[in-house]
C-alpha cells in the first residue's frame, strides 16, 4: 500500500470485511438544519469511547539551497515602491510598516514566509535556507525564507528565546480553488517574549514575566520615584510595587528576571542601561504611562469604579506602571479590553507588594547564597531551589520559586504552612495519596489562560477536566488535616460545584484522545449535537455506498483485489495492480500511472465525491462551532479555575517540602517574631547543616555545627584557613533562615529562629567591568549598602572585607565595620576573616564573640574537620591550603622561605619598637 493513500474504510471507521452486497436506498441530499435534526432522531447514534488515531507527524523539509539573485534595491521593504508590488506583497509591506520592530511571518499555502530584511535575518537566526520570490515585473526577486505552517510554533519559540517579537499573519479563509482569487489574510497573533501563552514556548516550572516600569522625572538619583508592574499572562498573576532611588530600582530590575521590560522612552532606557547594560528593554513610545489613562484602563479592565478597591489608592507610580502595562497588552491583543469578547488576556487583581511584609533578599544575596542558580556556572543543580523542590506539578514548582523570592515575616502564616507539612509527615499514606493525585495533573493556571485567550486545543480542555475531577479527592485529604491551616485550604474544602459540572460537560462532549488539529474534526462525541449526528449519519451512508460501489466494480471487472481509495490531492479513485490493466472496463477513466499500480476514476464516484466533501466540510465546521462554544464556557470560568489552581499549587509546594524533610531528616523550627522584645535577636540552631552541600556529598557525612545569637553574642568573628568550610557555614545560616521563613522544615536537630527583615551578604568580589568598578570598589559599595540599610532585625553575613587594598587599610576598615555592626546596628552578624587581629575586638565589645574552624596538622599535612568551635584562630594555613590545591612544590617551598623571612622581620620590628 502506498504511503500517500488512505484506505477509505479507515477514513470512515467502517468495517469493510463483509463482502456481501447490500441494497442501498437513495441518500438524501442538501438537508437543512431541521432535516438533519429529524434524521438524527430517526437513527440515533450511540456514544462510543474510542481512541482517535492520529497520523504520525512528518517534518517537512525546507527547500534546498538555490542561487539567489536579488536586486540590491529590493533588499528592504522600505525602499521598494508599493505601487509596483504584487497584491500579496503590497499587503505584506503594509503590515510590515505597522510592525517595524517585529518579525512578520506571512502565511502562503503550507508555509509561513518572511521577505526582505526579515527573510535574511530569520535565515541566519533559524539556520534555514534563504531563497527568493518574484515581487512584480518591475521589482524582480526579493529575499524570502519560510518555515512549514505546522512547525511554526517551534520556530517561533527559537525566535522568542533570542528576544525577538513575532507577528503572525494567517489565512482567514480557505482557498476557493479559483486561480487568481485573493485569499483573505490578517494578523491573528502578536507574540512577544513576555506575552507567550503557547506551551512549547514556555518554561513549565518558571513564571514568564512581562514588566512595565514608570520612572518619575527627577534630577537626583536618590529622589527618583518609580513604579513597577509585572504580569505572567500565561497564569494571570499580576504584581505591582513602587519605591524610591535608582539603586533600589536597579536591584529590583535584576531580581525581576523578566522576559520583556516595557519602558516609555529612549531617555529612560539610557538611564536604566547605566545601572546594568546587560538587560534589554522594549521602548514603546506609543505606550501611555499617564495617570489619567492609567486610571481609565485599570477601571475598565477590572470592571471597577474606584482604584481603592484593589489597593492602588495614593499609589500613583504603581498605578502609572500598571496603566502602561495594560496599554501595551492592549496593543498586542486588541481584544483584551473587550469584556464581551471570548478571546482576551485574563489577569488577576493586582497584588500590591510592600517591603514591610516580606523578607527582603537583594539580588547580590540571591546570587551569593545560590538560591535559584549556582554562582559560578549559573546552573540550577546545586542551588537551594534544586535541593528542596520535590513538587509534582508545574504550578507547585512556580509557587515554591515565588516563596523563595519573598519569604514571609508573619509568624502565624509561617506556622500554618508548617502545619500542612506536619500533616504530610505524620501520615505516609496521606502523603502518597496526594502524590498520586498530583502526579499527572495538568498546568491548570496556564491551560485556563490559553482557553481565555482562544488558543486552547481540545487536549487542553481534556486536561482541565481531568484536573477538576480530582478536586473531590483532594478535598477528602484536606479534611483529614489537623492543626490551624492556611486560608487557601478553605477553597479546596468548599469546591465550586460549577467547576465539577464544567468538567463533566467537557468529558461528555470531547472524546478522550482528540486530534491535535481542531480543523480535522473527530473530536466531538456522538449524541452531543443533533445536527452533527445527522451529518455523520449521511457520512456513514456515503461510506456504505463506497463499499457497495467497490463490490460492484469488482464484479464488473472481475478484479478481486480492486480497492477504492482516497488521495488528498485528487480524491477517490479505483486502484488496481498493473498486471490487471487489460481487465479495466471502458467506463473507467485513467487518472494516474505508478510503477506497480494504475488508478482510475468513474463519473459516479466523482459525483458522489463532491457530496462527500460537502458533508465532511459541514460536519467539521459544526464540530468547530461546538468546540468553540465549549472553550468559551471554560474561558468564562478562568478566574475560578486559576484560583483553585493556586491553592493546589500551594498544596503541592508544601507536599514537596514534606518529602524533602523526610528524605533529609529536617526538623520543624520554633520561630520568634520580629516584635518580640523579650527574645530580641535570639537565634539558636543545634547541629545545623547546609542543605545544598549535604545533598551534593551523596554518601559522605556532612559535619553539622551549632550557632547562637543573643544579647551577648550578636557578632561572630569566624577565623580559619582557606577551604576549611567558613563560606559554607556562612551560607548555611542564610539558607536555614530563608527555609524557616518560607514555612519549610530545616536541616538541624533543633532550632529557635528569630524572624529577619532582611538578609545581607558580602561574599567574594570581582571587578564590575560594565560600570568600571574595581574589586575593592565593588566590595566597598556592597559594604556601604549593608551599613546604610541594615536594621537590628537583619541578618548580615560577611566573608572578608578589605582584601582589595593594603593590609593595614583593609584591617582598619574591617575593624571599623565590625564595631559599627555590633554597637550601632546590633544585628545578628557573622564575619569570616583572615585578619586574626579582629579577635581582639572581643576584649572591648561585650556582644562580639570569636569562633574558629578546627584544623588538625600532621607535619606538613592539614586535615579539615569543618567543625566550628568557640575561640579565635591565629594561623591561616595558606601555604598548606595551596599545597592541597596542587600548586607546584617549588613554589610551595619558596613561599615557606618568604613566610619565615617576613615573620622574622615582623619580630625584629616589634622588638625595636
From Swiss-Prot:
The UniProt entry, under Pfam families, shows:
MutS_I (PF01624), MutS_II (PF05188), MutS_III (PF05192), MutS_IV (PF05190), MutS_V (PF00488)
What family is it from?
Belongs to the DNA mismatch repair MutS family.
**PANTHER family given in the database record:** DNA MISMATCH REPAIR PROTEIN MSH1, MITOCHONDRIAL, DNA MISMATCH REPAIR PROTEIN MUTS FAMILY MEMBER
In the UniProt record, the signal sequence range is none
Please provide the record's keywords in A-Z order.
Answer: ATP-binding, DNA damage, DNA repair, DNA-binding, Nucleotide-binding
Supply the CDD domains for this chain: ABC_MutS1
Alphabetized InterPro entries for the sequence: DNA_mismatch_repair_MutS, DNA_mismatch_repair_MutS-lik_N, DNA_mismatch_repair_MutS/MSH, DNA_mismatch_repair_MutS_C, DNA_mismatch_repair_MutS_clamp, DNA_mismatch_repair_MutS_core, DNA_mismatch_repair_MutS_N, DNA_mismatch_repair_MutS_sf
What SUPFAM superfamilies does this protein's entry cite? Answer: DNA repair protein MutS, domain I, DNA repair protein MutS, domain II, DNA repair protein MutS, domain III, P-loop containing nucleoside triphosphate hydrolases
Q: Name one GO molecular function term.
A: mismatched DNA binding
Q: Which GO terms describe its cellular component?
A: cytosol
Q: What is this protein called?
A: DNA mismatch repair protein MutS
Q: What does this protein do?
A: This protein is involved in the repair of mismatches in DNA. It is possible that it carries out the mismatch recognition step. This protein has a weak ATPase activity.
Binding positions for ATP per the UniProt entry = 720-727
* Gene Ontology terms: biological process: mismatch repair
Question: What is the organism field in this record?
Answer: Prochlorococcus marinus (strain MIT 9312)
Tell me the disulfide pairings in this chain: none
Amino acid at each position: 500500500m502506498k504511503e500517500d493513500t488512505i484506505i477509505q474504510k479507515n477514513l470512515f471507521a467502517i468495517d469493510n470485511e463483509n463482502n456481501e452486497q447490500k441494497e442501498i436506498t437513495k441518500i438524501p441530499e442538501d438537508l437543512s438544519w431541521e432535516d438533519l435534526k429529524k434524521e438524527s432522531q430517526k437513527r440515533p447514534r450511540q456514544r462510543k469511547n474510542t481512541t482517535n488515531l492520529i497520523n504520525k507527524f512528518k517534518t517537512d523539509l525546507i527547500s534546498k539551497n538555490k542561487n539567489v539573485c536579488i536586486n540590491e534595491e529590493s533588499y528592504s521593504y522600505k525602499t521598494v515602491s508599493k505601487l509596483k508590488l504584487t497584491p500579496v506583497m503590497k499587503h505584506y509591506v503594509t503590515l510590515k510598516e505597522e510592525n517595524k520592530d517585529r518579525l512578520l511571518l506571512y502565511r502562503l499555502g503550507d508555509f509561513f514566509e518572511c521577505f526582505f530584511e526579515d527573510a535574511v535575518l530569520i535565515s541566519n537566526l533559524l539556520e534555514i535556507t534563504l531563497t527568493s520570490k518574484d515581487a512584480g515585473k518591475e521589482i524582480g526577486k526579493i529575499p524570502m525564507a519560510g518555515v512549514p505552517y505546522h512547525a511554526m510554533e517551534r520556530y517561533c519559540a527559537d525566535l522568542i528565546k533570542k528576544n525577538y517579537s513575532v507577528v503572525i499573519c494567517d489565512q482567514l479563509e480557505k482557498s476557493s480553488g479559483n486561480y487568481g482569487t485573493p485569499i483573505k489574510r490578517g494578523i491573528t497573533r502578536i507574540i512577544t517574549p513576555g506575552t507567550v501563552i503557547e506551551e512549547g514556548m514556555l518554561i513549565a516550572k518558571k513564571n514568564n514575566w512581562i514588566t512595565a516600569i514608570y520612572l518619575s522625572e527627577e534630577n537626583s538619583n536618590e529622589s527618583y520615584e518609580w513604579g513597577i508592574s509585572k504580569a505572567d499572562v500565561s497564569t494571570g498573576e499580576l504584581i505591582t510595587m513602587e519605591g524610591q532611588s535608582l539603586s533600589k530600582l536597579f536591584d529590583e530590575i535584576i531580581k525581576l528576571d523578566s522576559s520583556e521590560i516595557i519602558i516609555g522612552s529612549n531617555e529612560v532606557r539610557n538611564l536604566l542601561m547605566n545601572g546594568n547594560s546587560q538587560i534589554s528593554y522594549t521602548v514603546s513610545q506609543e505606550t501611555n504611562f499617564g495617570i489619567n489613562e492609567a486610571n481609565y484602563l485599570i477601571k475598565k479592565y477590572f470592571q471597577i469604579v474606584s482604584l481603592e478597591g484593589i489597593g492602588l489608592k495614593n499609589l500613583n507610580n504603581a498605578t502609572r506602571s500598571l496603566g502602561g502595562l495594560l496599554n501595551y497588552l492592549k496593543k498586542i491583543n486588541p481584544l483584551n479590553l473587550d469584556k464581551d469578547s471570548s478571546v482576551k488576556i485574563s489577569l488577576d487583581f493586582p497584588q500590591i507588594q510592600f517591603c514591610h511584609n516580606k523578607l527582603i533578599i537583594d539580588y547580590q544575596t540571591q546570587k551569593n547564597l545560590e538560591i535559584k542558580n549556582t554562582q559560578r556556572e549559573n546552573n540550577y543543580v546545586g542551588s537551594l531551589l534544586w535541593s528542596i523542590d520535590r513538587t509534582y506539578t508545574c504550578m507547585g514548582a512556580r509557587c515554591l520559586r515565588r516563596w523563595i523570592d519573598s519569604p514571609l515575616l508573619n509568624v502565624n502564616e509561617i506556622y500554618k504552612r508548617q502545619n500542612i507539612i506536619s500533616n504530610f509527615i505524620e501520615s505516609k499514606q496521606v502523603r502518597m495519596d496526594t502524590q498520586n493525585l498530583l502526579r499527572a495533573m495538568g498546568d491548570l493556571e496556564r491551560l485556563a489562560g490559553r482557553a481565555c485567550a482562544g488558543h486552547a486545543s481540545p487536549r487542553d480542555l481534556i486536561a482541565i477536566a481531568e484536573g477538576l475531577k480530582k478536586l473531590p479527592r483532594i478535598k477528602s485529604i484536606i479534611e483529614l488535616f489537623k492543626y490551624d491551616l492556611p486560608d487557601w485550604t478553605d477553597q479546596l474544602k468548599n469546591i465550586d460545584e460549577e467547576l465539577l459540572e464544567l468538567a463533566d460537560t467537557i468529558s461528555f462532549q470531547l472524546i478522550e484522545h482528540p486530534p491535535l488539529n481542531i480543523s480535522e474534526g473527530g473530536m466531538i462525541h456522538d449524541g452531543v449535537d443533533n445536527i452533527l449526528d445527522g451529518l455523520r449519519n449521511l457520512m456513514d451512508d456515503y461510506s456504505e455506498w463506497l463499499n457497495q460501489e467497490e463490490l460492484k466494480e469488482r464484479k464488473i471487472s472481475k478484479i478481486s483485489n480492486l480497492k477504492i481509495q482516497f488521495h488528498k490531492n485528487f480524491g477517490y479513485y479505483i486502484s488496481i495492480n498493473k498486471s490487471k490493466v487489460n481487465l479495466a472496463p471502458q467506463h473507467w477513466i485513467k487518472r494516474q500511472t505508478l510503477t506497480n499500480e494504475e488508478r482510475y476514476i468513474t463519473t459516479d464516484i466523482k459525483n458522489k465525491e463532491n457530496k462527500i466533501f460537502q458533508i465532511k466540510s459541514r460536519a467539521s465546521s459544526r464540530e468547530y462551532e461546538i468546540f468553540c462554544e465549549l472553550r468559551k464556557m471554560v474561558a468564562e470560568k478562568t478566574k475560578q479555575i486559576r484560583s483553585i489552581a493556586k491553592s493546589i499549587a500551594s498544596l503541592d509546594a508544601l507536599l514537596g517540602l514534606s518529602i524533602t524533610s523526610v528524605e533529609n531528616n529536617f526538623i520543624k523550627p520554633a520561630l520568634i517574631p520580629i516584635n518580640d522584645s523579650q527574645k530580641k535577636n535570639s537565634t539558636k540552631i543545634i547541629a545545623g547543616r547546609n542543605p545544598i552541600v549535604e545533598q551534593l556529598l551523596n554518601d559522605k557525612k556532612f559535619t553539622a555545627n551549632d550557632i547562637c545569637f543573643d544579647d551577648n553574642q550578636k557578632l561572630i568573628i569566624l577565623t580559619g584557613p582557606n577551604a576549611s568550610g567558613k563560606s559554607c557555614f556562612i551560607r548555611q545560616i542564610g539558607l536555614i533562615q530563608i527555609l524557616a521563613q518560607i514555612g519549610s522544615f530545616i536541616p538541624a536537630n533543633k532550632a529557635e529562629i528569630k524572624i529577619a527583615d532582611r538578609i545581607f551578604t558580602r561574599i567574594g568580589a570581582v571587578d564590575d567591568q560594565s560600570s568600571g568598578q574595581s574589586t575593592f570598589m565593588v566590595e566597598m559599595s556592597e559594604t556601604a549598602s549593608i551599613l546604610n540599610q541594615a536594621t537590628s532585625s537583619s541578618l548580615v553575613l560577611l566573608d572578608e572585607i578589605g582584601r582589595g587594598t593594603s593590609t593595614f587599610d583593609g584591617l582598619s576598615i574591617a575593624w571599623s565595620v565590625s564595631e559599627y555592626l555590633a554597637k550601632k546596628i546590633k544585628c545578628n552578624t557573622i564575619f569570616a576573616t583572615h585578619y586574626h587581629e579582629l579577635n581582639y575586638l572581643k576584649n572591648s565589645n561585650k556582644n562580639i564573640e570569636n569562633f574558629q574552624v578546627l584544623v588538625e596538622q600532621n607535619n606538613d599535612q592539614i586535615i579539615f574537620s569543618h567543625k566550628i568551635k568557640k575561640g579565635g584562630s591565629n594561623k591561616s594555613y595558606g601555604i598548606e591550603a595551596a599545597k592541597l590545591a596542587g600548586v607546584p612544590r617549588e613554589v610551595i617551598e619558596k613561599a615557606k622561605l618568604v613566610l619565615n623571612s617576613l615573620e622574622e622581620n615582623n619580630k625584629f620590628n616589634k622588638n625595636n619598637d
